[in-house]
Amino acid sequence: MIPGELFPAEGEILLNAERAQITLVVSNAGDRPVQVGSHYHFAETNPALEFDREAARGMRLDIPAGTAVRFEPGQTREVRLVSYAGSREVYGFNGRIMGKL
């Protein structure tokens, strides 16, 4: 093995393939853009975003780690969300959960 050497897998790698998924329509009713990162608890996003927050509880965007989705003022778009894995505990963000989902 050479330091930094990569051993890529054959075929396609599917992100979040075994996780529960939902699609929501989200509208930015605010006057400023809102950007949401890949692992942010979607139910706790900026209040200017209008969508079914209860359906989004325990979910995050189904996008690659380290990326984000930007909602421009007045924009409406569909997003796909996936459930959190692991211990399914949420801390921080807007402090609405602070524990088990």
UniProtKB/Swiss-Prot annotation:
Q: Which domain of life is it from?
A: Bacteria
Q: How does it assemble?
A: Heterotrimer of UreA (gamma), UreB (beta) and UreC (alpha) subunits. Three heterotrimers associate to form the active enzyme.
Would you identify the family this protein belongs to, as annotated?
Answer: Belongs to the urease beta subunit family.
EC top class, as a word: hydrolase
MF term (GO), any = urease activity
Gene name as annotated: ureB
Looking at the UniProt entry, the stretches that span the membrane are none
**EC nos:** 3.5.1.5
Keyword terms of this UniProt record: Cytoplasm, Hydrolase
Please write the reaction equations for the catalytic activity of this protein.
urea + 2 H2O + H(+) = hydrogencarbonate + 2 NH4(+)
Listed GO cellular component terms? urease complex
Q: Which GO terms describe its biological process?
A: urea catabolic process
Pathway membership:
Nitrogen metabolism; urea degradation; CO(2) and NH(3) from urea (urease route): step 1/1
Keyword hit for Hydrolase: yes
Q: Where in the cell is it found?
A: Cytoplasm
State what protein this is by name: Urease subunit beta
